[in-house]
Amino acid sequence: TLLIAERCEVEFDTKANYMPVFPTPEGEDETSWLIKEVASGLAYRYPDGVPDHVRKQADYELDVIISMGFPGYFLVVADFINWAKENGIRVGPGRGSGAGSMVAYALRITDLDPLKHGLIFERFLNPDRVSMPDFDVDFDDRRRSEVIDYVTRKYGDERVTMIVTYGTIKTKQALKDSARVMDQPFSMGESLTKALPPAVMAKDIPLKDIEDPAAPRYGEAAPFRELIATDPVAKEVFETAKGLEGLKRQWGVHAAGVIMSSVPVIDVIPIMRRLQDGQVITQ
């Protein structure tokens, strides 16, 4: 494995665009179809006639969206959100800077009239600050998997993947794991973890800080230092645990993240299939 690692040469193209391509009707491209969908959406939102200031805002946003190359992004997001609504899946009304877009309101991505509520489009997409648009989308968690299945069928399972997460070994886990693999009784791990200072904001003191006088919580760790100073076995467990802290312990799947790509994901990043259900996940 070392030989293989030394032969690997990886370069990331950070400027490449892998946004999924939205399938448009014959004779249309993403830009022309977005313009038509927005016009149809405005008529739906304003059945008594589209006010001039609303149309002006929508036209301005379309110019920005098209010039920045994001028509497909809006079409893709609108498609799976509206599919969810049409299939009785609860969808949030809109959250974050995306709620400031009139185009998003017309496409039913959001359900908040941005002009009525004084929301600003430029917080979401600004030609002077080139960055990807980012809609915060909320689905009923009980049926979220149906939306993922929909986009997987539409764009292909080789282009849709879940995102891996890695759990790291924290302070208490490192102590307990070390005690266990060193064939120490369960009480050894318990006594060490109970001697630690109380967690602050759900975070335990790092093991390296326990013996570092310059560390901010060094003084609170006096009982722990006393324990390892008087018990050679506890000291050995502690030293072993320092080598484990921060290492990856297990992998999981991100609760909300899904990647959609215009090319097979395997051509861009390493992936794997979960044994239980065959779900594709990034590595």
Task: Name what the model sees in each region.
Residues L2-Q283:
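Alpha-helical scaffold/interaction cores of sigma-54-like transcription cofactors
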